[in-house]
């Protein structure tokens, strides 16, 4: 059970919510603020004075006053009319994060929503009844309206859910969770819909996947150093201290630890080769830059995870209702775009190491890593697959945040495209996962072909690979080998061997 303290979520909590079947409860210390916000909205509605989002229309229709007897209908219509998403359902892990983030935002007491509504979301979450949310349809301002409308519609008994993974109607989902359809009161529909929780949830979910890939890439890169008989001298701490970038220093330390005690490395320490190619030698510089970007993105996303991104905002202590733009997801878009650059570069560098290993003139290994070349093609086309995926990632890494299209009759004339920025991270991560799987197979093949042993830490990695895929002797149906190693990548079977850990794993 995780106790959500609104405004104080941590990265380890968020990773746990996304990855583990934990249940949620709300910190009772937040109840007074939630109740005060709800009362403030009720008082404003009773007075009848125009207040945006409480008794007016929305967007371009904000100047339209809504009579008191139509306020509940206004909220219902808002939810139903905004539930216009298309595409595949959002991943289960992202939906779990989305609900947790929405609860945190609402729980800070500036949205004017009743605890009854929040309790319903918690009951759905804990019963493993998750709204079916189409993943496409948000431009990241005014908040993630369409995705959050699909979440909210379930509370009204409209739409679809997944009950313990099985697709069902919202009515059935409410029944399983022990709930009846809700009637939303003034501002509650808007409070549920307005916010950056969909884009932030998608970005966080993919951040955690990319963190796992990063650690796997450090392991794969170290194994490739031994497979190519590369030098460990470029990882000397003194080099990296002189430059001073934290990520570079940390990455170099990981490579040193992974390669410590390698007999392969000791066997060629005094050879005549002066410098390795950049894909081996500059790993700390490239992977360090990726690490710095990822850490910055994590910091931004954690701030956003704890933010109140509703509009308008209620200040119960003064009774004020302030309209602003906290729903604009530009920080999330920038963070996701930076993550895309890092994830694509992780895959691009791995692809270059695969190319090095299969090139006999660079690696000193048999061409395409197979002894009887000619009749056997070995890793020739596996590298082509890696190249195709790396190239695709370069297109996917184009920043979504540089685009904007005006919506709502030009009232919402600049938007962030944060949801697409966050969503396409999943495709980049999937491509990078497969590139790393190919590199791990190629590097293991290269280490097998060396006379000496790799380091003790990397020997454990070799055991993991060889427990699933045998040494490549003759050409065979290769795709299943890549698939089984890619599955191990997702299961963090290689990441666990990395001496480095992220803040979300603490």
Swiss-Prot record:
Which one GO biological process term can you cite for this protein?
L-histidine catabolic process to glutamate and formate
- Please give the residue positions where the record annotates the modification 2,3-didehydroalanine (Ser): 142
Keyword rRNA-binding assigned: no
What is the recorded post-translational modification? Contains an active site 4-methylidene-imidazol-5-one (MIO), which is formed autocatalytically by cyclization and dehydration of residues Ala-Ser-Gly.
- Cite the annotated pathway: Amino-acid degradation; L-histidine degradation into L-glutamate; N-formimidoyl-L-glutamate from L-histidine: step 1/3
A Gene Ontology molecular function term for this protein is: histidine ammonia-lyase activity
**Keyword Iron on entry:** no
What are the record's GO terms for cellular component? cytoplasm
In terms of superkingdom, the source organism counts as: Bacteria
List the subcellular locations.
Cytoplasm
Alphabetically sorted, this entry's keywords are:
Cytoplasm, Histidine metabolism, Lyase
Chief place of localization: cytoplasm
Q: Which reaction does it catalyse?
A: L-histidine = trans-urocanate + NH4(+)
UniProt enzyme class: lyase
Linked residues for 5-imidazolinone (Ala-Gly): 141-143
Q: What PROSITE patterns does the entry give?
A: PAL_HISTIDASE
Report the InterPro entries cross-referenced here: Aromatic_Lyase (IPR001106), Fumarase/histidase_N (IPR024083), HutH (IPR005921), L-Aspartase-like (IPR008948), Phe/His_NH3-lyase_AS (IPR022313)
Q: What is its EC number?
A: 4.3.1.3
What family is reported?
Belongs to the PAL/histidase family.
PANTHER family attached here?
A: HISTIDINE AMMONIA-LYASE (PTHR10362)
Record protein name field: Histidine ammonia-lyase
């Amino acid at each position: 059970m995780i106790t959500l303290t609104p405004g104080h979520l941590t990265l380890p909590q968020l990773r746990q919510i996304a990855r583990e079947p934990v249940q949620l409860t709300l910190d009772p210390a937040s109840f007074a603020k939630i109740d005060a916000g709800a009362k403030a909205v009720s008082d404003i509605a009773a007075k009848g004075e125009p207040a945006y989002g409480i008794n007016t229309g929305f967007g371009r229709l904000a100047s339209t006053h809504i009579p008191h007897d139509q306020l509940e209908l206004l909220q219902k219509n808002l939810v139903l009319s905004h539930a216009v998403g298309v595409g595949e359902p959002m991943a289960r892990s992202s939906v779990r994060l989305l609900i947790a983030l929405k609860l945190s935002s609402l729980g800070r007491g500036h949205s004017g929503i009743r605890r009854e509504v929040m309790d319903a979301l918690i009951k759905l979450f804990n019963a493993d009844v998750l709204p079916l949310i189409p993943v496409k349809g948000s431009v990241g301002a005014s908040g993630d309206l369409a995705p959050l409308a699909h979440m909210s519609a379930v509370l009204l008994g409209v739409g679809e859910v997944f009950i313990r993974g099985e697709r069902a109607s919202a009515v059935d989902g409410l029944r399983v969770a022990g709930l009846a359809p809700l009637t939303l009161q003034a501002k509650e529909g808007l409070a549920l819909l307005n916010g950056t929780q969909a884009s932030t949830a998608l970005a966080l979910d993919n951040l955690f996947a990319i963190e796992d890939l990063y650690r796997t890439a450090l392991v794969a890169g170290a194994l490739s150093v031994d497979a190519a008989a590369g030098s460990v001298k470029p990882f000397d701490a003194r080099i990296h201290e002189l430059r001073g970038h934290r990520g570079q220093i940390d990455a170099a330390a990981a490579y040193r630890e992974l390669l410590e005690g390698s007999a392969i490395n000791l066997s060629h320490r005094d050879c005549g080769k002066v410098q390795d190619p950049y894909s081996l030698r500059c790993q700390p510089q490239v992977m360090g830059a990726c690490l710095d970007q990822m850490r910055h993105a994590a910091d931004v996303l954690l701030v956003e995870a704890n933010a109140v991104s509703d509009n308008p905002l209620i200040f119960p202590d003064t009774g004020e209702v302030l309209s602003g733009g906290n729903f604009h997801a530009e920080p999330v878009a920038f963070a996701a775009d930076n993550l895309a650059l890092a994830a694509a570069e992780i895959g691009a560098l791995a692809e270059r190491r695969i190319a090095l290993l299969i090139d006999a003139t660079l690696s000193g290994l048999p061409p395409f890593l197979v002894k009887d070349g000619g009749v056997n093609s070995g890793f020739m086309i596996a590298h082509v697959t890696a190249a195709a995926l790396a190239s695709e990632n370069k297109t996917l890494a184009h920043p979504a945040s540089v685009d904007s299209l005006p919506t709502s009759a030009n009232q919402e004339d600049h938007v962030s495209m944060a949801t697409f920025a966050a969503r396409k991270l999943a495709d980049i991560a999937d491509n990078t996962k497969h590139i790393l799987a190919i590199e791990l197979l190629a590097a293991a093949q290269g280490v097998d072909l060396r006379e000496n042993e790799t380091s003790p830490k990397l020997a454990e990695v070799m055991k993991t690979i060889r427990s699933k895929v045998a040494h490549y002797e003759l050409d065979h149906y290769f795709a299943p080998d890549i698939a089984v190693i890619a599955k191990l990548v997702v299961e963090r079977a290689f990441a666990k061997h990395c001496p480095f850990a992220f803040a979300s794993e603490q």
